[in-house]
Amino acid sequence: MRAASTNKALLAAAASLAPAGMIIDPFDRLAEVPPFNPDHETPTPPAIVALWRGEIGISDGLLISTPEYARGVPGSLKNALDWLVSSEVFPGKPVALFQASERGGAVQAALRLILETMSAKLVEPAMLTLPLLGTQTDAVAIAANPAHSNKIREALEAYARFLA
């Protein structure tokens, strides 16, 4: 994820606003996940894939915040999701999608299709789109803006209720 990513800032703001007991721990190593290859689907996958699957396995849910590239899902995210397809840790996993731009409709639609195919539980009340593109890209500023922080809290509280 880019250092100045608005989606990264949104996740950091969400982490600071999360309800008691909710920990948001971004996985920032997607770029290290090798290209998916079914031939490498063995009991001992590459170490970073094992780490990724392990993090997903111990989590109660998955919160995805991603940009839209060429009207779709960024390759690194799609690749990481591909590594979860045959894994027992993902089916039924509750997923919320956060979007830092109102222009992210295509990535949302593509992600929904992918995640539904993977048997995720999409948590509709926890879905969030904020018009952050071209505004505050700093997590502190996002969290300090009542219009944004209230919406983030509402989405996270809905997610927490679903996970409870």
Regions found by a protein language model. Name each.
Residues 29-45, 137-140:
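N-terminal beta-loop-helix "entrance" segment that forms/cooperates
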Residues 13-20, 114-122:
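Active-site-adjacent alpha-helix of alpha/beta-hydrolase-fold enzymes
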Residues 22-31, 35, 122-131:
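Short beta-strand elements in bilobed, periplasmic/extracellular small-molecule ligand-binding domains
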Residues 44-119:
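Helix-loop-strand module that forms the ligand-binding subsite of alpha/beta enzymes
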